[in-house]
Amino acid sequence: MASGQESRKELDRKAREGETVVPGGTGGKSVEAQEHLAEGRSRGGQTRREQLGQQGYSEMGKKGGLSTTDESGGERAAREGVTIDESKFTK
């Protein structure tokens, strides 16, 4: 059991140095904080999927995937002729 505690301490040290040690925990300053951030982000995505339905969630992902630092996903979709059905964004 001591090795588990040592491993967690090592992860905590890395987290304090700014390294992400838990997937989805970016920005947390400890292992525990990163775990909470990751859990909240996951739950937020699940809630959004429930609100929009699977098709709306997929369409929104398509639009978001087209966004860049220079232009929004909607602008790029219009420029490139990609069809995004925004009527699916509401359930």
UniProtKB/Swiss-Prot annotation:
Record field: compositional bias (Basic and acidic residues): 1-19, 32-51
Alphabetical UniProt keywords: Stress response
A Pfam family this chain is assigned to: LEA_5
Annotated TM spans: none
Any Gene Ontology biological process: response to abscisic acid
InterPro entries listed in its UniProt record: LEA_5 (IPR038956), Sm_Hydphi_plant_seed_CS (IPR022377), Small_hydrophilic_seed_prot (IPR000389)
Region (Disordered): 1-91
Superkingdom of the source species: Eukaryota
Inducers of expression: By abscisic acid (ABA) and osmotic stress.
Similarity field: Belongs to the small hydrophilic plant seed protein family.
Function: LEA proteins are late embryonic proteins abundant in higher plant seed embryos. They may play an essential role in seed survival and in controlling water exchanges during seed desiccation and imbibition.
Name of the featured protein: Late embryogenesis abundant protein EMB564
Organism: Zea mays (Maize)
